[in-house]
């Protein structure tokens, strides 16, 4: 079973600290020393707030990942139990966004050597002038693959709202639900 991270909405306060930690974890530079115009703020999770609840939405790393199955270029793969997007080969077709049942994938600008990458060979008509469009690629949670401390969002959450769901946690949850179900059934039989 693929591991994923989930946040408890009843604990989340919508502070977006997890989004900042995600950006820091995936940045090749110290964003705290950069001018705000130079920061590539592309978190791989999105905190959603409503009038009654807030929680981050992030990839569930599906077993039979619809995004991976939909990708015409094969850019989305299972890498060490993580559904991973190879942004270098992504063509920005957005098929994965349509396929994702959780809304966990965004399109972001592609960068190379700190500069926005332009689409190769695609020109657009801009008032009679030729211009080049920036290259956009898919972006989503990768569980901070390769990061020593694991997912950065979990490490910084002030309310400890995040938890890792892996096969052990899932098995414990199933056993607890079954236990509660038996208790409920036994109460029915005693009436």
Regions from the PLM with identified roles:
Residues 1-12, 17-18, 23-46:
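N-terminal cysteine/histidine-rich coordination modules
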Residues 28-69, 87-191:
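Flanking helices and flexible, charged tails adjoining ferredoxin-like Fe-S electron-transfer domains
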Residues 80-81:
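Short glycine/acidic-rich loop motifs that flank beta-strands on beta-rich extracellular proteins
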């Amino acid at each position: 079973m693929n591991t994923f991270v989930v946040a408890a909405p009843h604990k989340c306060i919508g502070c977006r600290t997890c989004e900042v930690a995600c950006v820091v974890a995936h940045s090749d530079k110290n964003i705290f020393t950069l001018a705000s115009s130079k920061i590539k703020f592309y978190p791989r999770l999105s905190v959603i707030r409503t009038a009654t609840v807030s929680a981050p939405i992030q990839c569930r790393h599906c077993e039979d990942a619809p995004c991976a199955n939909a990708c015409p270029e094969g850019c989305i793969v299972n890498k060490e139990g993580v559904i991973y997007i190879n942004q270098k080969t992504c063509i920005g077709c957005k098929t994965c966004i349509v396929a994702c049942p959780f809304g966990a994938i965004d399109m972001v600008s592609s960068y190379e050597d700190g500069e926005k990458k332009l689409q190769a060979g695609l020109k657009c008509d801009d008032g009679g002038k030729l211009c080049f469009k920036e290259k956009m690629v898919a972006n989503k949670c990768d569980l901070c693959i390769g990061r020593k401390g694991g997912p950065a969002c979990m490490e910084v959450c002030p309310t400890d709202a995040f938890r890792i769901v892996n096969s052990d946690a899932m098995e414990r949850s199933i056993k607890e639900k079954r236990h509660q179900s038996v208790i409920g059934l036994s109460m029915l039989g005693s009436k």
